[in-house]
Amino acid sequence: MADTVTSARATARYVRVTPMKARRVIDTVRGKSVEEALDILKYAPQSASEPVYKVVASAAANAENNFGLDRNSLVIAQAWADEGPTMRRFRPRAQGRAFHVRKRTSHITVVVESQKGSAQ
């Protein structure tokens, strides 16, 4: 029975970015080290890179502070973006019409794992 914890997670819920756009950013950093992922996300032009950056940094901080894992050995083991609730709005159009506007939200989850722990 191993009592040592080798992974930590962080979740951002109800983020105002579409899940499809968030997944596009997440796919670029999945499997990379935390430091490399943060460098990529810091300069990525996509709007979804900011919330993903915050979740990755939070997961790394959780691993470091809650479980005593070394930040330099952390790797993004899993990352995904689920669909949150959709806010529905109306955009008035000509001649009394109205178009539906769907403002989609995401739940972004990142799991970081100690590379040394997964090698054992």
UniProtKB/Swiss-Prot annotation:
Intrachain disulfide bonds: none
Keywords: Ribonucleoprotein, Ribosomal protein, RNA-binding, rRNA-binding
InterPro entries found in the cross-reference section: Ribosomal_uL22 (IPR001063), Ribosomal_uL22_bac/chlpt-type (IPR005727), Ribosomal_uL22_bac/org-type (IPR047867), Ribosomal_uL22_CS (IPR018260), Ribosomal_uL22_sf (IPR036394)
One example of a Gene Ontology biological process annotation: translation
Superkingdom classification of source: Bacteria
CDD domains: Ribosomal_L22
NCBIfam families: rplV_bact (TIGR01044)
Function, as annotated: This protein binds specifically to 23S rRNA; its binding is stimulated by other ribosomal proteins, e.g. L4, L17, and L20. It is important during the early stages of 50S assembly. It makes multiple contacts with different domains of the 23S rRNA in the assembled 50S subunit and ribosome.
Subunit details: Part of the 50S ribosomal subunit.
A Pfam family this chain is assigned to: Ribosomal_L22
PROSITE patterns: RIBOSOMAL_L22 (PS00464)
Record flagged with keyword DNA-binding: no
GO cellular component, one term: cytosolic large ribosomal subunit
Record's protein name: Large ribosomal subunit protein uL22
Gene Ontology molecular functions: rRNA binding; structural constituent of ribosome
Family of this protein: Belongs to the universal ribosomal protein uL22 family.
Organism: Corynebacterium kroppenstedtii (strain DSM 44385 / JCM 11950 / CIP 105744 / CCUG 35717)
